[in-house]
Amino acid sequence: RHPSRDKLVQLCFGMRLDETKASELLERGGCAALRPYVRRDVIIAFCLNRGMDISACDDLLWGLGEETITARPRDRRV
């Protein structure tokens, strides 16, 4: 069984990876790399490349109307 993409993204933040290394980890974990045509992925890449922590990235995602990384399913924005 593979971890979810969001779990792998959380790991990327914990390991302080940049966009390139994060995409590699996602692919090795059986998920799609960060995609430049997906708004949420662009925001995540922006945060990773600037060394932001996961809570700051979640705040930015929420503020821009995107699904956060650490939200539980019932808390996710529709």
Question: Where are the regions a protein language model picked out?
Answer:
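Short, basic-rich loop-to-helix N-cap that marks the start of a DNA-contacting helix
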Residues: R1-G14
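Short amphipathic recognition helices of helix-turn-helix/homeodomain-type DNA-binding modules
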Residues: K21-I54, D58, W62-T70
